[in-house]
Swiss-Prot record:
InterPro entries, alphabetized: Creatin/AminoP/Spt16_N, Creatinase/aminopeptidase-like, Creatinase_N, Pept_M24, Pept_M24B, Peptidase_M24_C, Peptidase_M24B_aminopep-P_CS, X-Pro_aminopeptidase_P
Entries under PROSITE patterns matching the protein: PROLINE_PEPTIDASE
Name of this chain's protein: Probable Xaa-Pro aminopeptidase P
Native organism: Ajellomyces dermatitidis (strain ER-3 / ATCC MYA-2586)
Entry keyword set: Aminopeptidase, Hydrolase, Manganese, Metal-binding, Metalloprotease, Protease
Entry binding sites for Mn(2+) 1: 425, 523, 537
GO biological process terms on file: proteolysis
Gene: AMPP
Taxonomic lineage: Eukaryota, Fungi, Dikarya, Ascomycota, Pezizomycotina
One Pfam family it belongs to: Peptidase_M24_C
Entry's family note: Belongs to the peptidase M24B family.
């Protein structure tokens, strides 16, 4: 997608800024729940900038506009931003962060405005300090200025019905989960926990929704105290069976009343403090470090609130046995769907000489997936990319402008689905012609990185920050690298990107150790801008493993892969693999055949393709 002319939108925004005496205005990507993926009505940064990537921040002054994003989106942003915008490449030397750039624009006593519901309390404090050093000030602007510019064209807020997530898939009742949470509150001597993250609420109550594309969540807040459980959600979203399910253990309150109730809790806490300067720990409410600045302010700020890494996000990331079994099962079905798609695609392109574009491919894959048991929908927008488009890390093919799939070029497909028993995310890079030596070399180096993570053995307490280099080492030896993390946590019929764990250089990945039951993606890559891109992705489960010595008398961990989709034999250069790596590939392909071949008893085309692609190397 090319640039959108943002001139009129920026002009109107600057008029509103001037009326409110705001000199610089920040437009984050997130919604009021700090969601990575958002509903169309919350796509404010995309509306004002024209940039459609999932990560980034827009900053507008009276004379300039800047968009900051990370390495996954540099190419995309360069194509989508019009001449009104400058691109701030996150992580580049001699390139200011968006916070630093904002502070520069605020020099000389200027006011920086932001909707306080769209940034966290800790972000607000840090940003305020940075801006004050330059002589400016940060101000919360309650009325969102982008919404005013957007006007009647802004999409309506979703009001989809909520559904039960059966215990056979959840593995644990919501009553048990709330009981566990209350034990954590007791340990911290807290008055309660105010929950704002949508996937945490869905997980806690074993409910699923459809308010955000690809993410089975719903708009809600919750407050859990030692004796009460309040769910803030619009009443029309709750079918009778859900109300009956929640029973008298959960009080349902209007979604919009959360801030009023938070203020009441704040006032109650202040009265209990008997005039002391700060409330005692037993009277403080916990909020996640990802809760909004506006929610923190409603609760009375730091004197009444303790910001913590959410105990729910930790519990949710450690899957129980029912969730793990679901992840294994859905990846077998999903692997079969991908195998059928790749066999079909090769036959159409090579044998039938059919002309297909990238969207034709992604549409066909969704149709094949939809036939499988427990399928609900996709877990993200499929990346179907040919040739140079594969070098755009988060490429999105648009029906009117996408490329024809070239059988003589690399084809990268990154896709996933939501099933009732789990969430999938798989990337495969294929070639239907004769790959170049560089393409084979790059693919094989990336494969070696994937195998290094898959076969890693490490002591309890090791973080994903430490493991990240395992995947990059083979590329590093050649002076190559990739500008994205190696892996992210994956939800169980929830968000495909799930914290707090992952493999990469983000600070948070150094704070949380890999734990048995974590489900993580393993997805190294390599990208040559304008030429081709390689990425291979499997989903892995952390587990305890036996070692010969067990140094330190502590558990040692490793991984189990659950993705069951063949690698591309044509792109593997066996001479670059060790004997151990060749054995891994052969063992993996043997397992893929064992788990998925039965799906193709009556499909000779796919069965033959699968047999060929899983032959020993």
């Amino acid at each position: 997608m090319g640039p959108v002319d943002t001139s009129q939108r920026l002009a109107r925004l600057r008029e509103l800024m001037q009326e409110r005496k705001v000199d610089v205005y920040i437009v984050p990507s997130e919604d009021s729940h700090q969601s990575e993926y958002i509903a169309p009505c919350d796509g404010r940064r995309e509306f004002i900038s024209g940039f459609t990537g999932s990560a980034g921040c827009a900053i507008v002054s009276m004379s300039k506009a800047a968009l900051s994003t990370d390495g996954r989106y540099f190419n995309q942003a360069a194509k989508q931003l019009d001449n009104n915008w400058m691109l701030l490449k996150r992580g580049f030397e001699n390139m200011p962060t968006w916070q630093e750039w904002t502070a520069e624009q605020a020099e000389g006593g200027k006011v920086v405005g932001v909707d306080p519901s769209l940034i966290t309390a800790s972000e607000a404090r840090s940003l305020s300090e940075t801006i004050e050093k330059s002589g400016g000030s940060l101000q919360g602007v309650q009325e969102n200025l982008i919404d005013l510019v957007w006007g009647k064209e802004r999409p309506a807020r979703p009001s989809e019905k909520v559904a039960l997530h059966p215990i056979e898939f959840a593995g644990k009742s919501f009553e048990e989960k709330i009981s566990d949470l209350r034990k954590e509150l007791q340990k911290k001597k807290s008055a309660g926990f105010v929950i704002s993250m949508l996937d945490e609420i869905a997980w806690l109550f074993n409910l699923r929704g459809n308010d955000i594309p690809y993410n089975p969540v719903f708009f809600a807040y919750a407050i859990i105290t030692p004796t009460t459980a309040d769910l803030y959600i619009d009443d029309e979203k709750l079918p009778a069976e859900v109300k009956k399910y929640l029973g008298d253990q959960v009080s349902v309150k209007p979604y919009g009343s959360i801030f009023e109730d938070a203020k009441a809790l704040s006032q109650s806490a202040q009265k209990k403090s008997d005039g002391d300067a700060s409330t005692s720990p037993s009277e403080k409410f916990l909020i996640s470090t990802k809760a909004s600045w506006s929610l923190s302010l409603a609760l009375g700020g730091e004197k009444n609130v303790e910001e913590v890494r959410s105990p729910i996000t930790d519990a949710k990331a450690i899957k129980n046995e029912a969730e793990l079994e679901g992840m294994r099962a859905c990846h077998i079905r999903d692997g079969a769907a991908l195998t059928e798609y790749f066999a079909w695609l090769e036959n159409e392109l090579v044998n039938k000489k059919t002309v297909l574009n990238e969207v034709d491919g992604s549409d066909k894959l969704e149709q094949i997936r939809s036939k499988h048991k427990h399928f609900v929908g996709l877990s993200f927008d499929t990346i179907s990319s040919t040739g140079p488009n594969a070098a755009v890390i988060h490429y999105k093919a648009e029906r009117d402008t996408c490329s024809i799939i070239d059988p003589k070029a690399v084809y990268l497909c990154d896709s996933g689905a939501q099933y009732l028993d789990g969430t999938t995310d798989t990337t495969r890079t294929l070639h239907f012609g004769e790959p170049t030596e560089m393409e084979r070399k790059a693919y094989t180096l990336v494969l070696k990185g994937l195998i290094s993570i898959d076969t890693a053995v490490f002591p309890k307490g090791t973080t994903g920050f430490a493991l990240d280099a395992f995947a990059r080492q083979h590329l590093w030896k050649e002076g190559l690298d990739y500008l994205h993390g190696t892996g992210h946590g994956v939800g169980s019929y929830l968000n495909v990107h799930e914290g707090p764990i992952g493999l990469g250089t983000r600070v948070q990945y150094a704070e949380v150790a890999i734990t048995p039951g974590n489900v993580i993606s393993d997805e190294p890559g390599f990208y040559e801008d304008g030429v081709f891109g390689i990425r291979i992705e499997n989903i892995i489960i952390a587990k305890e493993v036996k070692t010969t010595h067990g140094f330190g008398e502590k558990p040692w961990l490793g991984f189990e892969h659950v993705t069951m989709t063949p690698l591309c034999q044509k792109l593997i250069n066996p001479s670059l693999l060790t004997d151990g790596e060749k054995k891994w590939v052969n063992d993996y392909h043997s397992k893929v055949w064992e788990k998925t071949s039965s799906y193709f008893e009556n499909d000779e085309l796919t069965r033959n393709w699968l047999k060929r692609e899983t032959q020993p190397i």
